[in-house]
Every structure is written in C-alpha cells, then in structure tokens.
Design a protein with these regions (language model features):
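Extended oligomerization regions of viral-like shell subunits
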Residues: 107-235, 240-246, 250
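Acidic/polar, low-complexity extended loops/arms that serve as protein-protein interfaces
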Residues: 1-145, 172, 185, 237
C-alpha cells in the first residue's frame, strides 16, 4: 500500500534553487570544509610561510519528521486507486512543506534542523537599492560564486516589487522575477518578510532512508479504520555560512 513514487525533491523550492540533496544516508555524516591555502610573496632566499588552510566539519544527523493518519476502511475500499494517489500527493506535499518551512524558518526547534533565518534581526527601515547592492558586495568579498539566487517570502516579494530603485527611473527593485539581475524564487515557507540570497549549492539537505510508511490495521480496527504511520529523517545545514546573506525586511 502507498508505494510513494513521486520524488520529494521535485516538491522543494530549495532544490530549484540548487541545494545539494543527499539521499540514502546512514548514521551521522560529517562534510569537510576547507578554508583554502594561503600563499605569500617572499624574497629570493627567504623562508616560506605556512600556507595551510584549516579544515572544519559540518555535521548532519537525522531528525525525525512524523505523523499518523487514521483512514476509514470504507473510504479505502470505495476507490482504492484514487484514495492511494490522493494520499501519496498529500503526504509528499506535507513533508516537503514542513521541511522547507523549518529550513527557511526563523526558529530553533528541538529535534529539527535549525532555521536559516534564526537570529536574523528584522530591518528597522525600508530596504533600498543600496542595501541590495550591499548584499551582493558581501558575497563577492567572501569570494562566493556560482549560481546565485534569491529565495524570498511572498510578503518580501511584494515589498521588493513595490520598492522604487530611485526617484526618477520608474523602475522597481524586483522586475521580471529578478532582483539586481539575480533570479528570485518565492515560497511561503520563508518566515515573515525573509530574504535569503546566496549560492544554494552550499546548502546541504540530507535524507536518511526513504519515507517510511507503516500500515497498522489493528489499533483502530474496532472503529473501522486503518492507521498509517509516517516517518522520515532529515537534516539541513549550510556547508559555508558565508555563502548566504539574510535579511528580514521592515
């Protein structure tokens, strides 16, 4: 029953943004990050300096996303094919929505991945074009390159689309699904008026196993129901913190 064939990844806006998606993980995972070697100019016979960079680790560990659903046996036998397809879509959508809302959220939840906007203080003044350029500059100064994108909430998108670049051009901060020449992806999973800008390839989403579905025909048997227990295991962290600039708009 309920062999879910629809890939979860296809439902994630973060996958469209370029996040690195790791599946089939076993045990806790450590992803090494290297700060990069350093070289210096020296005299002809002067001693060379130690140019070794530093290794750090980003650790991923499984966090359980779970629920149970009680289904009427009558509902299942009346139209089993349609019921199964509906449940497949609903379960995948629910997991995708919760996973992204957690990753793109502003909270630290026990036994869950930390939200990327956690600790970000909301702006006290309206965003300006200078602020947007400053975000770009911050990434460039950190040597962040790649497929740079914005991921924003609907309310942040509305704000950007109505923020004028200047007094005379008639142009706005967001036009044609771009801000400052960079693509914008919008999802209600982003907390508040959140804006996350960066190289999302440096965001790692890990999944342990598949979406585990256990059919329990006994617990609710007296009530004519079947209990479906859902378990899935995920974690998500930036591989490089400096790959992202985050704001919560006023």
């Amino acid at each position: 029953m309920l062999n879910i064939l629809e890939p979860l990844r296809a439902k994630l806006v973060l996958a469209q943004a370029g996040a690195s998606y790791m599946t089939g993980l076993v045990g806790n995972i450590s992803i090494p990050a290297y700060s990069g070697s350093q070289v210096t100019w020296e005299g002809e016979v002067a001693d060379a300096k130690d140019g070794a960079g530093t290794f750090t680790e980003v650790k991923l560990e499984p966090h359980r996303l779970t629920a149970y659903i009680d289904l009427s046996k009558q509902f299942l036998i009346q139209d089993s094919v349609s019921a199964e397809e509906m449940l497949k879509r609903d379960i995948v959508n629910a997991i995708a929505n919760k996973l992204e809302a957690t990753i793109l959220g502003s909270e630290t939840i026990v036994n869950a991945p930390e939200g990327m906007l956690n600790g970000v203080v909301a702006d006290s003044e309206a965003i300006t074009y200078e602020d947007i350029v400053a975000m770009e500059t911050e990434l460039e100064e950190a040597n962040v390159r790649g497929d740079i994108k914005f991921v924003v909430s609907p309310s942040a998108k509305a704000k950007l689309k109505t923020t004028k670049l200047d007094a005379g051009s008639g142009k706005f901060a967001m036009e044609g699904n771009e801000v400052n020449g960079y693509p914008v992806l919008c999802t209600s999973a982003v907390a508040g008026k959140g804006v996350i800008y960066g190289n999302f390839n440096d965001l790692v989403i890990g999944q342990w196993g598949g979406i585990d579905l256990t059919v329990d025909p006994y617990t609710q048997a007296a009530n004519g129901k079947v209990r479906l227990v859902i378990n899935a295991y995920f974690d998500a962290k930036p591989r490089r913190a400096e790959s992202f600039v985050k704001k919560i708009l006023a």
